[in-house]
Amino acid sequence: MAVLQPPKTNYGKMKLFINGKWIESSTESYIPVYDPGKGEVIAEMPSATKEEIDEAVEAAYEAFKSWSRLPVPERMQYIFRMKYLLEENKEALARVNTQNHGKTIRESRGDLRRTIENVEAAISALYSLAKGEYQQEIAKDIDEVLTREPVGVFSIITPYNFPIMIPFWFIPYALALGDTLVVKVSPVTPLPMMATMEILANELPPGVLNLIYADDAMSEHLVTHPLVEGTAFVGTSRVGLRVYELSASHGKRFLGGGSASNYAVVMPDADLDRTVSVLRDSKFGNTGQRCL
């Protein structure tokens, strides 16, 4: 079992994770990262340069050539290892999550539980998602065969409110199915995913999973990069629409989730005590940054 250490109080200048290595950015643009509970700057996040974005995408592109050809059971072993490492380090990651985001430690532990469940779901669904179909005599003297193959490099752009959980809505599925990734997280809460990558860094082949930080202009460069096949996005509807427009205009795939605040219909026979408790947590839980 991992020895639990308290989170750092000063992370210094953060690094990019590209092609299996932590790289100090050559950018002159650094963004302060806060511990909102104390109002203190605890890290400086680099906004990657165009050349660094290109390097990350090209690393993922080169890694795809071998990663996509691995048999499904071999890729599955990497995802099993990912699950084990997340479980082994979930308390340490939850503490970094709370430190950088501000949510309660109970909520962060819940985030890690859901993160691990996403990995488990990817493992359980992999063979169904990867297998093709065969239809005999679909028409006279015609049989139909459908195969599913890895697509290529995808970018993942995620918001600040669930810094680890939301990236893992996509990471285990994409990797298990043979694609490679460049992940761009929110500049508000970049530390939890950085801490996660520190745990996973030596467990995947170089270039398969890359982590960068970028401003708006460089994020658009990532989305429209010629070697990127598509983008998975979660964030505000305004930004999501922009990513959708960029993806569509460049002939790329897009999977998006935008802003949401669900309505509640309270029926006359509802248990009001329970209803009010649920609505309160939905509205004010996660420091008021929940979209469910």
Regions found by a protein language model. Give the residues of each.
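ALDH superfamily catalytic-core signature
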Residues: R238-L292
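Periplasmic-binding protein-like
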Residues: P172, G230-V234
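Conserved small-residue-rich beta-alpha loop and adjacent elements
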Residues: Y134-P205
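Short gly/pro/ser/thr-enriched loop/turn and capping motifs at secondary-structure boundaries
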Residues: V188-L191, L211, M218, R238-L241, ...
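N-terminal Rossmann-like NAD(P)+-binding subdomain of aldehyde/semialdehyde dehydrogenases
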Residues: M1-I142
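Hydrophobic residues in well-ordered beta-strands that form the structural core
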Residues: V183-K184, Y213, G256
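A structured beta-alpha segment of the ubiquitous adenosine-cofactor-binding alpha/beta core
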Residues: D143-E144, L211-E229
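Residue-level signal for inorganic ion chemistry
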Residues: G39, R75, N97, G178, ...
